[in-house]
Amino acid sequence: MDLDDFRSVMDNAGVDVWTFIDTAILVASLDYGQELKRRRDNIVERLYATSMANKCRNCDFGGGGNVTEAAIGRVNNGRVHEETEEEDEEGVTAAAEEEVREKSVNVEDDDDFDPFAGLFDDEQKSIVEIKEKLEDPDLSEESLVELLQNLEDMDITFQALQETDIGRHVNRVRKHPSNNVRRLAKQLVKKWKETVDEWVKFNQPGDLEPPSLIADEDSPVQKALHNGSRQQVPDFGYSPVPQNGYSSSSKNSNITEPERKPRPVAPQPRRESPSPAKPSRPSPSQQTIPRDKEHKEVDFDTARKRLQQNYRQAENAKKQRTIQVMDIHDIPKPKKGGFFPRKGGSSQGGRHW
């Protein structure tokens, strides 16, 4: 487009050049996103190049910024003439290459309006590139370890995890034959799980339902979902249950509370009446056990007493039945005197033995 024609368009629209540029970038990002991604490097290079008025507006800067000719369109009697003009090639290319190499593009952040619509997020771009490389089945162990280490060095947010879907690809290499690969994969999954836990803590269950980032049935969060957790959350790593997992315990309590409220209405008094009676009242079999023990002890005592009495009686009987055998000479002699008592006080009438 000719410069004069462009100026006339802005005058007719009643907008300045900066509003026109912002609107053009926004429309390009919405309607021609892929084309804008392909052209954005050249656009940034042109922004930092010098002498823009002397450059061709339609030439391609894909060759690293080497510009040798510039065309200026002029209107003369309805015909467009192009004139070429040589520039200082070394100065232009050196400045452009230095700016591109150092990546010193400083764009002011605007929270209310994002004209680039997130297209210049270098972190997400790197994550997507790593994800594409992880899809290669012939990837060597060294390359895989390097990619996982690069992911570990990044501070990936929940939004980046959700948009790039890197969690699923890393979760697939948790069962890799290499110990280093398995260790790095588990560390990443654990780190990202903590990020998801923080996001869940600061967001109410009913506000948003983020899609699961890893569809692995071995993950604890996926098991928690099968066990009754209805809130859809990303699945990462091992969690004893936190999980069980993580804050799903609070969610499960919130979900099960309304189910427990109607239950105590009728069954509780029925269950309470027999429950305290069981430990207080021993069964008949339990009551007979101590009684049998007491009877046995009493029987033992009486039997012991009877035996002792029998032994005593036997000893006494033996003593009574003992016959003393004595020699005739050992028999004691009777005392002197009459057998019959004396009469009359005289000793002559009596007999002596």
UniProtKB/Swiss-Prot annotation:
It is found in: Nucleus. Residues 241-256 have a biased composition (Polar residues). One of its GO terms (cellular component) is nucleus. Keywords: Coiled coil, Elongation factor, Nucleus, Phosphoprotein, Protein biosynthesis, Transcription, Transcription regulation. Signal peptide: none annotated. InterPro entries: MD26C-like, TFIIS/CRSP70_N_sub, TFIIS/LEDGF_dom_sf, TFIIS_N. Residues 298-327 form a coiled coil. It comes from the Eukaryota. Residues 225-353 are annotated as: Disordered. One of its GO terms (molecular function) is translation elongation factor activity. It holds the Pfam family Med26. Residues 290-304 have a biased composition (Basic and acidic residues). The modification Phosphothreonine is found at T84. Residues 125-199 form the TFIIS N-terminal domain. The modification Phosphoserine is found at S219. SMART domains: TFS2N (SM00509). Belongs to the Mediator complex subunit 26 family. Component of the Mediator complex. Component of the Mediator complex, a coactivator involved in the regulated transcription of nearly all RNA polymerase II-dependent genes. Mediator functions as a bridge to convey information from gene-specific regulatory proteins to the basal RNA polymerase II transcription machinery. The Mediator complex, having a compact conformation in its free form, is recruited to promoters by direct interactions with regulatory proteins and serves for the assembly of a functional preinitiation complex with RNA polymerase II and the general transcription factors. This is Probable mediator of RNA polymerase II transcription subunit 26c. It comes from Arabidopsis thaliana (Mouse-ear cress). The gene is MED26C.
